[in-house]
Regions:
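N-terminal glycine/serine-rich phosphate-binding loop of ATP-dependent small-molecule kinases
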Residues: 1-43, 59-120, 133-143
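A short acidic Gly-Thr/Ser loop motif
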Residues: 45-51, 174-180, 257-260, 343
Length: 368
């Protein structure tokens, strides 16, 4: 997804298509605090292996309304798989982006108690990850917390729950990051989806692209090698093998939440500029995903860089993301994939708003 460090995108409030043809709720449906003009602002900051993203929102009746957003590709994990450390230039890029995030938070008047700032795989893996987090705290005032893969996956699932087709028996949520990919299997029990299993594969778009540099020739062989690499990483899924039958028979579907799938969606739709209201909630078939990946491969690096939904910063990563999605679709062959331009940040916002609704212990004691 292209960076957006200008004015906030107005289409964050748009409503994605549901499986029944109706529109889904604004923002991300779920728990929320007080709504209306006087509602407080909440912030969610996600520093990943590839991107630095910020959302600022206020609660609404059916979720939340985004009032400001920021996204910049920083490639914090560049070279990490080779050295085990965050590179100086990569840290500087991330630091500059975080400075801008801090300025936006201050400008909007978001209270520090209502800002959740997290770091994921790159800082988890790097031996100097904690030192970088401390540098950010001292220099920007932002207190980032390195979260583990379990919490990262849980938040991503929460952020896209209202994109689940309520008529199916199972859903697989795939969150493709820069340094890892989280997979979450949920099954329908009554009116709710319950987590059946989870895994974090240490393969993301940055790590896969670094392992498999794009060659001058034999692009098909290169792409298949990336698919096989990811396939090996997810071969041992921590769920009952019988669950796969639900995907084969059309009683389950996949939700993809990342730039990997939104990029494929933009190519599939032929967008001349990225439009979240057309991408978020879109249904794609497996054939649609494969055709979009083939289009990207035939474009070449220069052609991909010129695509408005890809851009030069993602031109060398987007096919790694497509290969990851294809590996998942081969292992869990759902005919339908739902595109989610939402995930971890939205989960962070919903978690805060849910906590704000809970009565304090003092108030509970006063009523007893």
């Amino acid at each position: 997804m292209p960076e957006t460090d200008g004015a906030p995108r107005r289409d964050h409030r748009s409503q994605p298509r549901r499986s029944d043809g109706k529109r889904a709720a604004n923002g991300a449906a779920g728990d929320h605090g007080a709504s209306g003009r006087d509602a407080p602002l909440y912030g969610a900051l996600d520093l990943g292996t590839n991107n630095c993203r910020l959302l600022i929102a206020k609660p609404s009746r059916d979720g939340f309304r985004v009032v400001d957003s920021f996204s910049r590709i920083v490639r914090l994990g560049e070279g990490l798989s080779r050295t085990g450390r965050l590179d100086d230039a990569a840290m500087d890029r991330a630091y500059e982006a975080l400075l801008l995030c801090g300025e936006r938070v201050a400008k909007r008047g978001v209270d520090s108690s209502r800002l959740m700032a997290v770091a994921t795989q790159a800082c988890r893996q790097a031996e100097n990850g904690e030192a970088f987090i401390e540098r950010v705290r001292l220099g920007t005032g932002l207190k980032l917390r390195i979260i583990d893969p379990v919490e990262e996956a849980r938040l991503a699932v929460r952020g896209c729950l209202n994109l689940f087709d309520q008529s199916v028996e199972a859903v697989l949520v795939v969150d493709v990051g820069g340094g890892s990919t989280e997979l979450n299997w949920l099954t329908k029990r009554g009116d709710a989806f319950v987590l059946e299993g989870w895994m974090s594969a240490p393969v993301g778009v940055v790590t896969l692209a670094e392992r498999h540099p794009e060659p001058a020739g034999d692009l098909d062989g290169w792409y298949e090698a990336m698919v096989a690499d990811m396939g090996a990483a997810i071969a041992e899924a921590p769920v009952n093998p019988a669950l796969r039958d639900l995907f084969v028979s059309g009683r389950a579907h996949i939700v993809g939440t990342s730039g990997a799938i939104t990029s494929l969606a933009g190519i599939h739709l032929g967008l001349r500029r990225y439009q979240r209201n057309l991408v978020d909630g879109l249904w794609m078939t497996r054939a649609d995903c494969e055709a979009a990946a083939d289009t990207l491969m035939r474009l070449g690096a220069a052609g991909r860089a010129a695509e408005p939904c890809i851009g030069p910063d993602r031109a060398d990563l987007v096919l790694a993301g497509a290969a990851i999605m294809e590996a998942v679709q081969r292992a869990w062959p759902s005919e339908r994939v739902r595109v989610a331009d939402r995930g971890l940040r939205e989960g962070l916002l919903l978690q805060q708003m849910r906590e704000a609704r809970k009565p304090s212990r003092r108030r509970r004691r006063g009523r007893s």
